Every structure is written in C-alpha cells, then in structure tokens.
Design a protein with these regions (language model features):
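C-terminal or mid-to-C-terminal helical accessory/interaction module adjacent to the motor/catalytic core
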Residues: 175-202, 237, 256, 260-265, ...
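Conserved catalytic core of nucleic-acid polymerases
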Residues: 475-478, 532, 640-643, 647-648, ...
C-alpha cells in the first residue's frame, strides 16, 4: 500500500519569502502589476508537487483580523511592518491558483496558520500519514515527531532540506523538538513582539534548556546560575512563562481533518489558463499544462495601477485581448568550432554587421575570471561556440577587438573586465540588451532568460548539472559536456541578437535612444576600466584605526556603565532600553508593555540625546561599531590578492533613478560627515608616487531644481554667486543677507534639501527639532518665496498621475505605478518620488555624461592618469606625476560642460595624498 504523504504549506511564510527573494529583480505584468510573490509561490508549489509527489496537500493561511493570542496580549505582533501593497494584491490570486490546482485553502478565524498546521499535523498521526510541514519559520519545529517533519524549501540555489527529530535537535542544540518552545520563551521573537528574557540569545537559551530541560525547571533552579544571567532570568520570570504561552502552537483548533479534500485532485485547466493568462505566466502555463497549454487565447492581463503597458503606453482593450502565443522552447542551430571549421566561422562572424555574443567565464568574479569560451550568433537561428584553448583564444580576441562588427550581448561590462585581465579589450561598437531594457523598464528583471520569455516568447535552455556530477568550484557550468555548454551559450547569444531590434524600436518610439547610445553604452567601457584599475587601501592605517576604535568602544562602554550605575551590555538594545527607561527614567512616556521591550532605535535615541549624557554615548558606541564592521575591518578583506587593490563593482541597471550603485564595497554609503567617517576616506590612496584627485559637483541638485523649475528667485540667487542657503534664509525670514543667523541658515539649508524629497511639516519639524507649527510656517514661507519650485512639484505629480512616469531633463523615465494607489502611505511615497526622480535622475545623467567626456578626452590627449571611483556627485582619480594641472583642467572643464542650463554647474576640485586630503 502506498505511504500516505501529507504536505502542509505555511502560505504567508512562503509568499513573503518569494516576494523578498525577487526584491531586486521583480516580475511585472505588461499592466505594471508586481507578480513576484505569486510567481515565486507557484514555482515553490510546482517544485514540491513534482519532486515530492505528495498524496495529500493543504495550504494554510492566517485569517484577517486578530487571533486568540491578541486576546492574551494586545501588543502581539505590534512591531510587524505593514504588509506590502504588492502582497495584498497577490494573495487573492494565489488563493485562486491554489484552488485551481485542486488544493484546499485552510484558515480558521481566531487562529494563526501555525495553529491550523499544528492541529492538522497532530490529527494526521492517528491516520497513518507521513507529514511534512513546508515553511522556513523556526517556530513550527516544535511540532516535529517520528511522523512529522519540517520541509524547508530550497533558497538561492540551495536544495530543499528535510528536518526530522535529530536535525531539529542538532540545529537548536536540544534533546527533543518540543523544547523549541522553551528556546523561543527565552530568546523571544522580535517579529511577533515576544520579548522572552532580554539579553538571552539563541546560544545561551540552548545551553540553558540542554542543562535544565525546560524553562519551568530553569526558573526553579536559578540558584545554580551565576552573575548577570542569574539576574536576567530571576527578573524576567513572568515574561519567560508568558512568552512560552505565546510561542506554543495550539494543536486543538476546532477544524475537521478532511482526508478526501486533502487528497490530490486534477488541475482545473480552464481556471489555470485564465489566471496564468492574466498574470502573463506563459512559461509556467507550459510547465503546468504541457501540450495542453498551446493554441489557447491569452486572457486580458490583470489590471494594475495606471493601466500601463510594458513600455508605459496606455493599454487598449483590443491590444490586451489580442491572443499571444505561449512561449516555446528556443531552438537554434548550434555549431561547435573545431580546427577544421574555426577559421571559416570566425571570418563569417567578422563579415557581419551585427553579431550576438555570450562569453562563458571561469569564475563569478570578473577580476578572477578567464575566458572559457564564447558563443557567437550569426542570426537568431544560427550560432557557433568556440572553446577557449591556447590557440583558439586568439580567434576569440579577433572577434572581441573588431571595430567594424557590432557585438550584442548582456552584462558586457563583466566581459570587458575579463578581457582586460589578459590585456585585451572588447571594442566598440557593442550593445547591451540589459541596459537597453533598463531604460525602458528600470524596475523589472533584466536577465536574458526573462527578457527572452517576455519579448521573444521563447524559453531558453539553462545549465542542468546532474546531481551525481562533480561541480567545478569556480563555475559549475564548466563541469558539463561542451555540447551542453554550447547549447546554452549559443541560445543566449542568439536571444541577445534577436532582442536588439525589439528594444531599438521601443527606445525610438519613447524618444530614449539617445540615452542608450550617448550615455549608457559609452559608460560601460568607462566603468569596466575603473573596476579593473581598482584602488589601493592603506591597510596599516586601517589596522591602526581599528585598534583605536576598538579601544574607544571599550572606553565608551565603561563610561556608559558608570553613567548607568550598573553593569550592562551596551551592544544589547534590550538592556539599553531597561537602563534608559527603567533605571534612569529618561522618558516617562516610554511605557513598557507586559512582555515587550523598549525601542532604542537611532531615531528614538536622537530625540532623547539632550536628556542624559548616556544617550549620546550609546549613539556614539553604535556608530563606531557599525563603522568597524562595515568598513574598517571589512575593507582589507576585499583586497584582491593578485592586484593588492579593491575592485568595486558598479551596477548600471539596478537603481530606479538612473544612479549608479556599487558593491564590494558599497562606496555610496561611506560616511563623510564626521571625523570617524572621514578617516575611512583617508585610507583610500593612489599608487606609489602618484596623487589622489577629487572633483565634486557643488549643490548640483539645487542647481537642477533651479533649471527645471525656472524659479526666478532661485535662479537669481545662483547667478549672483550667493551662498544659496543664506540667500534662501534671507528671503524666507525677511532679513538682509548679512543679518542671517547661523540657525536661520541651518533651517534654510534643511528646507532646501528637504523640498527635493517632498518633506512634510512633520518631517521638517523632526529634522530641525522645532514645533510642527514653526515647520509648517517655514514650508509656507519657502513656497511663497520660491513659487516656481511649488509649481514644479505639483506638475511632476500631475505628470506621474497622467502618464504613470516622470522624466529627467534628458528624457530618462521613472515608472510610478503606485501614484494612484488607494493606500495613502504608498501613494505618498510615489508622489515624493515623482518630485525627486527628475532631480536625482538628471544628476545621475549629468555625472555619467561627465565620466564619458573625461574618459574620452584623457584618451585623446594621452593622459595616463586613471578615473578610480564614482560616489554620488563626485569623481576620484589616480594622477600620474606631471599630469596634475592637466587632469585638474580637463576634469573641471568636462564636468561643468556636461550640462548647459540657465544656472551653470560648478565643480570643486582638490589634490592630496589620499581621498580625504583631496576632498
């Protein structure tokens, strides 16, 4: 007899996991609806159905409203962030999909999904089931027994994990899974607002339960504890016992175990086709229905905010109703180059006007990678693959270096860096389909598989590594046979070639082709050169600074303990809250709930900084600790052992505004406004004997506001060369410029920059620490003084509502589908973006133009100095001796010439022995 296998899915845990897994490459319908959560959940469901083949299955949801735990504790889950609007929209679709699969949706008013799962799992034992609870949440581990296991779905390439009794006990360091409740009772759960025993983490909790078996036994034997731990437990007995009640999953929910309903049923093909059609899940439709998915009309896509098409056009009913074929498997004639045919193939490629390319590399990090091979598409239907050998690499280089053949690919910056590793280059002309798509849909995924599916209606083959294969640790794909590698690489090269005319047409229609050809594509080469050049770090200086900061941390901790008059862990938010509000009574309004802990976020502490000297010390402690972990101790770990430099990666297709971002390290977040942060910049140094040069745009965003708004008073102040913040203060406060006080200038400066981000009276009052009425008057005075700025803000919001996007001065678009959201918070965020995106996006365009101009001029004039870093509105260079004057002149000229408006740009420059001195 077949073993009955029951899968119980924790719906919301899987939905949130799917949503956040695709946070940086979300999926959207052509109507602008974010389908990431739905797509991820359905993929997970499909995977478990196919791989595990359960005989019975149910999906459990949390019901709307409160549960019995809220009756026990009113603030249960009070700290949870609001559910994202995209998930709220997704849930009804997910429930419809589950039902279309013939799977029951189970929820019970007054109980959480965990309780429903616990009850069904308990009932399944007596019915002979082998039960698997599918969830990433640790709480459910308390239910594990010989017939119930936890099934943790795979994540980020990792396989699914099944945890039985032994595995749960090993993970938590306990003897029995039921003791997970005791672990949670001690360590608490911030997400659910279960405080536990403040100051006791998971490791300590595990040790205590391993020794005492339960929290009840621990409480009865606190005389065996010592020091601070003894004090913590004894002073939190009620909290611990109450937390255990909250953490215990109820296994007696009043529901029936409907074995027939939970058994597998056929998929409702019509319903699946209808729902997947609306969501534009074409590849999923093919996977679920197979051949039955073919030759059916695609339903009208699901509506979303603004009813925008994939490219932002108004979507007509006729266009929406037009039948679209489901994606089919990509087919491409694939030839593998041999000694006999390689010359003919390469010559044929070099005779083309345009080819598609896809480079296969030996490592995921460009600076460590070599060329393993290259696929070249002669047409969308024919491609060849050259495996890199000592002889064939020269043929590959011939293709890359061609200045007559346009090379169309994806993520070409990576390929350029790899080519530079062998002192070669991928020469212009080239075309990157990810960048082209980024201009059209900046917040969508730009992966080649996704682009091919959406625009070509093709499913590209992917690398399938057999479970028994021994993977290449640098690039698992290289463990495959050359035929398999060639098939995937050639399909990608062919898809790139086929995508180019699709994107070119749309870019021309949307009048954005110039952004691609004049700004973004030329920048690829600039960024590749910067990444490959890298920057030196003074490790000795950082080591000394680390030692000094560590000593300061110890000194601050001692000072805090002295000020508190009690021993406590300054790094523990829970203990800090107890000291500030229970012992020192700094804020009488900071009421402590029955089992909650005080909020000691930076925002909270900043408001209290004037009430007691310990608050400032705690803030200082946290800033130093973050500085140490994020930069001082982390930067040396990022040094490439072969070059001795840090090679940051610039991301050209990530931010919605058009700004560049960087990773490993994130240069954009290096602090500069305090002495501690500036010491980090001091550690960035030029090559031996060279100088460090820095150039920074002066108040570029305010200058852009003046140019966009054409506000007469703002333009006049800039053209007069006045201190813009002092001039603003003089106008707002009706003072002569020379009579403006420092405090008035400070307020005007905050208002100037706050307006760019659509700051409210509440926000301004918080930032300036002034009454809201005064902040309101300040804002009213600002807009009375600068009516053109108010007009620009209103017009930007109206444009967003009308078109679904706003544009920079250069025509770059920021899509704003939430501008008509019914949720006031979500809509307000979109309105602030409507104001800020044209400003920030224009600044991004300008710095990119400047980088291109400087790079080309350096090349024309034979300048050997190198551009190293781009951070916000600042460029940094390694300057060869004797080129100081030339670099200073060229950089300043080209940065200021990058944009011509009524209010000119100004670049401030500096030279020094390191980044700090230069800046």
């Amino acid at each position: 007899m077949e073993q009955k296998k029951l899968f119980l899915l924790d719906a919301y845990a899987l939905i949130f996991r799917a949503y956040h897994a695709m946070k940086y490459s979300p999926r959207f319908t052509s109507g602008g609806m974010n389908t990431s959560a739905i797509f991820g959940f359905v993929n997970t469901l499909e995977e478990v159905l196919r791989k595990e083949n359960p005989t019975h299955i149910a999906v459990c949801f949390d019901p709307a409203g409160k549960t019995f735990r809220h009756e026990m504790f009113a603030d249960y889950k009070a700290g949870r962030e609001a559910t994202p609007e995209d998930i709220k929209v997704a849930v009804p679709y997910i429930k419809d999909i589950i039902r279309a699969y013939g799977i029951p949706v189970v929820e019970k008013e007054g109980y959480e999904a965990d309780d429903v799962i616990g009850t069904l799992a308990t009932m399944s034992r007596s019915r002979g089931f082998s039960t698997f609870i599918m969830s990433p949440d640790k709480d459910l581990s308390q239910l594990v027994d010989p017939s119930v296991k936890i099934y943790r779905p795979g994540y980020k390439g990792q396989p699914a994990e099944v945890r039985g009794e032994k595995e749960v006990c090993d993970v938590f360091g306990i003897n029995r899974p039921i003791q997970v409740i005791d672990i949670l009772a001690l360590m608490g759960d911030k997400v659910d607002n279960i405080v536990g025993c403040p100051g006791v983490g998971e490791k300590t909790a595990s040790k205590l339960i391993l020794e005492f078996d339960s929290v009840e036994n621990l409480i009865a034997n606190t005389d065996k504890l010592k020091g601070a731990l003894k004090t913590k437990v004894e002073s939190n007995v009620d909290n611990i016992l109450f937390s255990k009640k909250l953490a215990t999953i109820c296994t007696e929910v009043p529901i029936e175990f409907d074995e027939e309903a939970y058994s597998r049923h056929p998929v409702d093909e019509a319903a699946i086709r209808d729902i997947f059609g609306k969501l534009e899940f074409r590849s999923l439709l093919s996977r679920v229905l197979g051949d039955k998915a073919e030759a059916k009309p695609t339903p009208k896509p699901a509506p979303a905010f603004g009813e925008l098409s994939l490219f932002g056009d108004d979507m007509t009913d006729a266009a929406a109703a037009e039948a679209e074929p489901a994606p089919t498997e990509h087919t491409c004639k694939t030839i593998i180059a041999t000694d006999a045919n390689i010359d003919e193939l390469v010559d044929k490629a070099l005779s083309q006007k345009t080819i598609g390319i896809h480079m296969v590399c030996t490592a995921p990090n460009a600076m460590d990678a070599g060329i393993a091979g290259i696929a070249v598409a002669l047409s969308p239907d024919e491609a060849f693959y050259i495996e890199a050998t000592e002889e064939s690499v020269f043929d590959i280089i011939r293709i890359l270096k061609s200045e007559t053949v346009e090379k169309v690919g994806i993520n070409l910056k990576f390929d350029m860096v790899v080519a530079l590793n062998i002192a070669e280059k991928l020469a212009a002309p080239y075309y990157d389909v990810a960048i082209a798509h980024y201009l059209l849909q900046p917040e969508m995924s730009h992966s080649i598989n996704r682009l091919a599916e959406i625009y070509l209606k093709k499913i590209l083959p992917d690398y399938q590594l057999p479970a028994t294969a021994k993977a290449n640790k640098f690039n698992p794909a290289l463990s495959l046979e050359i035929e398999d590698i060639a098939k995937v690489a050639c399909a990608r090269a062919a898809a790139c070639l086929e995508l180019k005319p699709v994107f070119d047409k749309k870019l021309e229609e949307e009048k954005m082709a110039h952004l691609l050809h004049d700004i973004e594509l030329p920048l690829v080469e600039v960024l590749a050169d910067m990444e490959h050049t890298g920057v030196r770090i003074d490790t000795d200086a950082l080591a000394a600074y680390s030692k000094a900061l560590t000593q300061r941390l110890a000194d601050i901790e001692r000072t805090c303990i002295d000020l508190a008059g009690i021993q406590f862990n300054v790094g523990s938010p829970a203990q800090v809250g107890e000291v500030l509000f229970d012992r020192l009574k700094i804020d009488e309004k900071a009421k402590k709930t029955k089992t909650g802990q005080y909020s000691t976020t930076e925002e909270v502490l900043e408001k209290l900084s004037g009430k007691h000297p310990i608050v400032g010390k705690i803030l200082e402690f946290r800033k130093i600790k973050k500085l140490l972990s994020t930069y001082v101790n982390a930067l040396p770990e990022l040094i490439n052992p072969h070059t001795g430099k840090i090679h940051t990666t610039y991301n050209q297709t990530v931010t919605a505004t058009g700004r560049l971002s960087s990773t490993n390290p994130n240069l954009q977040n290096i602090p500069i406004r305090n002495d501690d942060g500036r010491e980090i910049r001091k550690a960035f140094i030029p090559d031996d004997g060279h100088s460090f040069f820095s150039a920074d745009y002066s108040q570029i965003e305010l200058r852009i506001v003046a140019n966009i708004s054409k506000d007469e008073a703002l333009v006049e102040a800039f053209l007069a060369g006045e201190d813009i913040h002092r001039a603003t203060a003089a106008k707002i406060f009706h003072e002569r410029t020379e009579d403006v006080t420092d405090d008035q200038r400070r307020k005007a400066k905050t208002a100037n920059f706050g307006m760019i981000y659509g700051i409210s009276a509440f926000g301004l009052s918080e930032r300036l620490q002034i009454p809201r009425s005064e902040a309101k008057q300040l804002i009213e005075g600002y807009f009375k003084t600068f009516p053109g700025v108010r007009r620009f803000m209103d017009q930007s919001i109206e444009m967003a509502k009308e078109k679904g996007f706003v544009t920079t001065l250069f025509g770059r678009r920021r899509m704003l589908p939430d501008i008509t959201s019914r949720n006031a918070v979500v809509r307000g965020y979109a309105e602030r973006n409507a104001i800020n995106a044209p400003i920030q996006g224009t600044a991004a365009d300008i710095i990119k133009i400047a980088m291109n101009r400087i790079y080309r001029r350096f090349d024309r004039e034979g300048i050997r100095s190198k551009m190293l870093l781009q951070v916000h509105d600042e460029l940094n260079f390694d300057v060869v001796p004797g080129e100081e004057d030339s670099v200073s002149r060229i950089v300043k000229e080209e940065m200021e010439a990058a944009f011509s408006g009524t209010v000119p740009l100004v670049a401030d420059c500096g030279l020094g022995a390191n980044w700090l001195e230069a800046h």
